Amino acid sequence: MPSGQFLMEDFAYAGGLQAVVRQLLEARLLDGDLLTVNGKSIKENAGSAEVFNADVIRPVTAPLTANGGIAVLRGNLAPNGAVLKPSAATAELMQHTGRAVVFDSIDDFHARVDDPTLEIDASSIMVLRNCGPCGYPGMAEVGNMPLPAKLLARGVRDMVRISDARMSGTAYGTVVLHVAPEAAVGGPLALVQQGDQIVLDVAGRRLELLVDPGELERRRQAWRAPPSSRQGYQALYVKHVLQADRGCDFDFLVGCRGAAVPALSLIHI
């Protein structure tokens, strides 16, 4: 599991997701009347799910940690939010100010990250942009950037990393993800330049770029959107996908769900 000592199989045998949902419903932390993709409510799906191992699925009154597993950060670098997984982060980096080392794409990252001449040290903040829902259609799991080889050789095992991409739920590191709005649509991440100072303050839920507002506006005026596909499904996707803070759904589907879809069984006995 992302946090704790148990495996995914242990979670399943302990009752699984619906057991967690039922506990949250009983604690009145979820609205059980909301509909889900199968046309049933959250409460209906949870049904009579039980917890069979309280060491794996802890009760709400005795959580694994005092704080939640996800921290939502906001600031001038992420006006609509970004997320970080504190349980996977390094405690010493949860309050950190560092110099930005910027990669404009995943290709740029792979081309330069292990260059011995790259100006980067353990205090730097790695920034990977144009990897969000529009910049890298599908929002690939590339946010947990591997550290530079020369720093790994010196024993560095974690650094602050910021991206509009996502990462696997079982990945580790002090990684800020899902920055919204993303760089490809002109979000502030697009305006970060090499050497800019960035502040990460997890306790304060802040993510700030220490650049004068006037300078940021000058950069905004000079910014140009990166090229994107103009045909086929990819073009449709880029045109209609919403940002990470809105679930990366299609804009034309918002408000159009809520009922079960009738279907004929293909199996007749």
Label each residue range with its predicted role.
Residues M1-E182, G187-L266:
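Catalytic or ion-coupling anion/metal-binding cores of large enzyme and transporter domains
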